[in-house]
Design a protein with these regions (language model features):
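Preference for bulky hydrophobic residues occupying beta-strand positions
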Residues: 14, 27, 230-233, 264, ...
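ABC transporter nucleotide-binding domain
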Residues: 173-267
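C-terminal coupling/interaction segments
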Residues: 3, 269-339
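A generic structural signal for secondary-structure junctions
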Residues: 82, 108, 143, 149, ...
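ABC transporter nucleotide-binding domains
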Residues: 4-9, 14-208, 213
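Solvent-exposed beta-strand sheet faces enriched in polar/charged residues
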Residues: 10, 231, 256, 291-293
Length: 339
């Protein structure tokens, strides 16, 4: 089983004093895939990553990364992983080439690896310039290159595109896709849910120290259902439109006065567009546009974490039938705990 998964944990537990940060975390990440780990602040993501990268010891359970046990073989785990944090790890006073050669020397990698990575990330021409003169996108590419010096089996990637413009963000996304195409496994933590939607083969949602849901992006969206949205003729009609949406969907509507929109998620298959239009008309709401569409991952995240906190039941399984709560790991990231 260990040969199938690049990251495999069972029953991970971690306490910090009275705080139970991780509660029986099970995770199974197949080799050569991207697993997106999402959750509110304080949910357990950071603690989980610190354990998997051998920076923190678990209080219970077990974990293997790149085929090695994090407790018994921490040095072997570190040789098999790369870690790219949210903040730049490179020295701004050194050139790009000097930074990578320094990493190569520290990690006992060939000196030629630095030149190879500069070329791969289109930094060769800037290689003789101090890193502090690089743009945000260039520095993130240099960070990513530094994390790949040892050709890791598993790359831990934290907030890889924070603060980047769309063009630079797309460049990082393309680089991550190339890595998985070559067989590297990526564990991605990000607050940009569009990023997880674009990159992740599977997503684990952690809340309150547990993995509450997991599956592909499409499966998690299917849990939530559809998103009903209307554009009203007059912003003054938004409260009335919200009342209609609340009655039909049972969800708290989201209002945008500037765009004159009201929207809410619904899992009720009887909520159709004709029904929505009729109810709005009966309420005297003038409508410019109305529609039902699949939810975004942001809407899924807000819906599932809000329902959990509000005490409402959330389905245990995505529509495709993959377990999302308790049970043994499958080919999808399984339940996990908090940070």
């Amino acid at each position: 089983m260990a040969s199938t998964y690049a990251v495999l944990s069972e029953g991970l537990e971690k306490r910090f004093g009275d705080v139970h940060a991780l509660r029986s975390l099970d995770l199974a990440v197949p080799r050569g895939t991207v697993c997106g780990v999402l959750g509110p602040n304080g949910a357990g993501k950071t603690t989980a990553v610190r354990i998997l990268t051998t920076l923190t010891a678990p209080d219970g359970g077990s974990a293997q990364v790149a085929g090695h046990d994090v407790r018994r073989e921490p040095a072997a785990v570190r040789r098999g992983i790369g870690v790219v944090g949210q903040y730049a790890s490179v020295d701004g006073d050194l050139t790009g080439a000097e930074n990578l050669r320094l990493f190569a020397r520290l990690l006992r990698a060939p000196r030629s690896r630095a030149a190879e990575l500069l070329e791969r990330f289109e930094l060769t021409e800037a290689g003789d310039r101090p890193a502090r003169t690089y743009s945000g996108g260039m520095r993130r590419r240099l960070d990513l290159a530094a994390g790949l010096i040892t050709r890791p089996d598993v790359l831990f990637l934290d907030e890889p595109t924070t603060g980047l413009d769309p063009h630079s963000r797309n460049g990082i996304w393309d680089a991550v896709r190339e890595l998985t195409g070559e067989g590297t496994t990526v564990l991605l933590t990000t607050q940009y849910l569009e990023e997880a939607d674009q990159l992740a083969d599977d997503i684990v949602l952690i809340d309150g120290g547990r993995a509450t849901h997991s599956g592909t992006p499409a499966e998690l969206k299917a849990l939530v259902g559809s998103y009903a949205e209307v554009v009203v003729l007059d912003a003054a009609a938004l409260p009335a439109a919200a009342a209609v949406l609340d009655q039909l969907t049972g969800s708290e509507p989201v209002l945008d006065a500037e765009k004159r929109t009201a929207g809410a998620v619904t899992t009720d298959p009887t909520v159709t567009l004709p029904l929505l239009v009729r109810e709005l008309d009966a309420a005297g709401v003038g409508v410019v546009d109305a529609g039902l569409r699949p939810p975004t991952l942001d809407e899924v995240f807000l819906r599932l974490t809000h329902r959990k906190r509000a005490g409402h039941p959330v389905p245990d399984r995505p529509s495709a039938g993959h377990p999302v709560a308790d049970g043994p790991p499958t080919d999808h990231s399984r339940k996990e705990p908090a940070a």
